[in-house]
From Swiss-Prot:
The active site is at residue 16. Keywords: Aromatic hydrocarbons catabolism, Lyase, Manganese, Metal-binding, Plasmid. Signal peptide: none annotated. The keyword Manganese applies. It comes from the Bacteria. The keyword Lyase applies. Substrate binds at residues 12-13, 166, 195, 286. The lineage of its organism: Bacteria, Bacillati, Actinomycetota, Actinomycetes, Mycobacteriales. Belongs to the 4-hydroxy-2-oxovalerate aldolase family. This is 4-hydroxy-2-oxovalerate aldolase 7.
Amino acid sequence: MTRLYIQDVTLRDGMHAIRHRLAPAQLRTIAAALDAAGVDAIEVSHGDGLAGSSLTYGPGSNTDWEWITAAADVVTNAKLTTLLLPGIGTIAELEHAHTLGVRSVRVATHATEADIAVQHISRARELGMDVSGFLMMSHMAAPAELARQAKLMEQAGAHCVYVTDSGGRLTMSDVRDRVRAYRDVLDEATQIGIHAHENLSLSVANSVVAVEEGVTRVDASLAGQGAGAGNCPIEAFIAVATLQGWEHGCDLFALQDSADDLVRPLQDRPVQVDRETLTLGYAGVYSSFLRHAERAAIEYGLDTRRILLEVGKRELVGGQEDMIVDVALDLLSSHA
């Protein structure tokens, strides 16, 4: 089979788990360790992508440029990657990231809004970058519709399109159906990627099913560091991939050491499946809403799970973090 492309997201999605607060020196150490461990690509930015630092998403301790520069100083083998959400990050910011050494970008939209990524994907291709389309909250679109959106990204120039389970809501059959739908409509040369979350404890299983269906790009992170219950833990996935006989370039023990020695100590809240993060997956809620919902629950004396269930019922998506307070106030008034 084709060699797997292991995309580490510790230094992007993992930012959600530490409220986007990471010193450049710490980032540099982790990036160097990942590079030495043989991952194919290292994604770096605020958790919500370039220019994500804001009151809505959460301010970062540093700028994207400081973080990217720190990584570029030490990454010599892996492809330095970043994330861009059109409407948050701009083409100008993409171009600046490129001047700092970023050579790959994932352009992310909601599952049904691929059309807003066309200009950004096209410009990234003009810059000579490796480009992936990133269809977030993939559980909110049926397989055929998601595949139609993936085709739009491919037509814009994406080398790869991801099934992106931002809510950690997909089951193995859900992943299988979406990957097959992609394969039915995408050109053979277009790669497919999987981005899993651990909210239902299925991130490794979903990633394995995806690879069995022909996916070659797999997102994962050290100790699963990421939003909600985290991403697919890279050390666990690589162990399984090795047992399966799948080709990759990663050093399992080096990844284990980096996860336990460098990443877990950073966590001010455990990245794990617990009552709150499980509810994210159960309700199909955007994983990065976790910290926002927990903060609102404390402020208004509510159970975080009640907030998350209502958020899921209303089908809120990324960018509507400010609505979480409205949800909390509505819950308070309904039980006054």
